[in-house]
């Protein structure tokens, strides 16, 4: 399912408003993975599709942030990995330190194997390729798999989602009227 999306981490998605009531939206950089897994959980697969709206895709990139794990791609990769651990656990996957180390080792080996391929693609397309920085990035992401896994194991009660609208409406039955009133009073 996840592998079928071309830009699963792009940050752009759309859905019909009737789906919104049951979806729990993640409150961190795991947004896209969390949303896709919520859609998978709540919808039949033939109601899900990807649409390319442009021939060119210009995504605004984050800095790598090698020195500050609370920012940039370092923070993003940590949150995304933790999101994947959480979601896989909801499908019955069991995690341990050993399993997380195995996932990190598999990621690291696959990433290293792809470096040569990406470098060749860059050369063929006249794009500069910084092999050293690419390898540093791979090492950072591998470390973040371990740290995200450790966070997941040591904080099992974390609530990473914003409550679904169905839950909000059950706690505050007139929430939608209050929101309309708030918007009207600002307008």
Model-identified regions with their sequence ranges:
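Conserved nucleotide-sugar donor-binding
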Residues: 8-23
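Conserved glycosyltransferase catalytic-site signature
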Residues: 8, 29-37
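Short, flexible, basic/aromatic active-site loop/helix in glycosyltransferases
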Residues: 1-5
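Catalytic donor-sugar/metal-binding loop of nucleotide-sugar-dependent glycosyltransferases
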Residues: 27, 37-56
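Short conserved micro-motifs at the rims of enzyme active sites and ligand-binding pockets
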Residues: 24, 60-64, 95
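Terminal low-complexity segments of carbohydrate-biosynthetic enzymes
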Residues: 67-187
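Active-site donor/metal-binding and catalytic loop motifs
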Residues: 49-69
């Amino acid at each position: 399912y996840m592998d079928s999306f071309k830009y699963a981490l792009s940050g752009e998605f759309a859905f019909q408003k009737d789906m919104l009531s049951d979806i729990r939206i993640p409150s961190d950089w795991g947004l896209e993975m969390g949303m896709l897994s919520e859609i998978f959980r709540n919808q039949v697969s033939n109601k899900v599709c990807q649409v390319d709206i442009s021939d060119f895709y210009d995504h605004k990139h984050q800095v790598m942030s090698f020195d500050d794990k609370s920012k940039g791609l370092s923070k993003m990769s940590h949150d995304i990995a933790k999101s994947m651990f959480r979601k896989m656990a909801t499908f019955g996957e069991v995690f341990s330190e050993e399993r997380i180390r195995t996932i990190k080792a598999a990621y690291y080996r696959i990433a290293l194997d792809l470096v040569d391929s990406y470098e060749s693609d860059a050369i063929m397309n006249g794009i500069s390729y910084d092999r050293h920085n690419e390898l540093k990035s791979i090492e950072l992401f591998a470390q973040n798999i371990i740290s995200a896994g450790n966070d997941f194991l040591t904080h099992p009660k974390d609530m990473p989602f914003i409550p679904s609208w169905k839950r909000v409406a059950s706690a505050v039955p007139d929430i939608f009227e209050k929101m309309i009133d708030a918007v009207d009073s600002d307008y």
